[in-house]
Amino acid sequence: MDIKAFKMDGLGNDFVIIDQRSQDFNLDKDQIIKICDRSFIGCDQLILIKKNKEIDANVEFFNSDGSISGACGNGTRCVADLLSKESGKKEITLLTTSGSLKSKILGNNLVETEIGIPKVNWQEIPLSKQLDTQDLKIEIIDRNNTKHIGGIAINVGNPHIIFFVDDIEAFDLKNIGPKIENHPLFPEKCNVTLAKVINRNLIKVKVWERGAGLTKACGTAACATAVAANINNLVEKTTDIEFVLGSLTISIDERNSIHMKGPVSDIKNINIKL
């Protein structure tokens, strides 16, 4: 089977995007895993674009382990840019399993997406039992065997836990990430972020992405981190979240809705042979 696809990324968070509006086929879990495997094509997530007569398109997100992801901020921005270049429209609306997302094309490869209102109640994360989502009291241990207890849970289309620490490099996230992702407190697993507040307009982060592992960037993690920092009055309503290859600007408006702005890569056409 020959598949026409696109490769894009947002700050190194990379995607294989397949437009199923013009290609009639289905992919099973094993095929998704193969496409995402970096010994084959390779990506953090695979994205399917599907027809929608009411809005621009439906999108489905799959992690590199073949699992479904309810939301993907950087992926949404990439698809919005792709469809904008196809249609000439400067505003793109996409329907995801987590709801409708609107994006604005700002030029110079910048795209802003409204992610919506975050969820902070324990049932909405969801957690397996009732706890204070602003202090989960989960223990993580740094490279010096020093224990740190905390964790803030936020759902921005998918579940996240954020640990604010003094030094994000003091932790082995490759070791900690899968343990927290699969913690019994999270029945749907979770994304794990280590965050250091630099000032009231900047936070540095490292992310372990649910179903994908260590990633260079994660849009929803940036959103969840900004929300958690705002709740605790650590930053302003607009703040930059810095990853290895650059930053996303996260703003929280008067309705408490999250807006994410950042760059997307150029579009690369690829062919996949399965």
Curated annotation (Swiss-Prot):
Transmembrane segments: none annotated. The gene is dapF. The keyword Cytoplasm applies. One of its GO terms (molecular function) is diaminopimelate epimerase activity. Pathway: Amino-acid biosynthesis; L-lysine biosynthesis via DAP pathway; DL-2,6-diaminopimelate from LL-2,6-diaminopimelate: step 1/1. Pfam families: DAP_epimerase. GO terms for biological process: lysine biosynthetic process via diaminopimelate. The lineage of its organism: Bacteria, Pseudomonadati, Pseudomonadota, Alphaproteobacteria, Candidatus Pelagibacterales. Keywords: Amino-acid biosynthesis, Cytoplasm, Isomerase, Lysine biosynthesis. This is Diaminopimelate epimerase. It comes from the Bacteria.
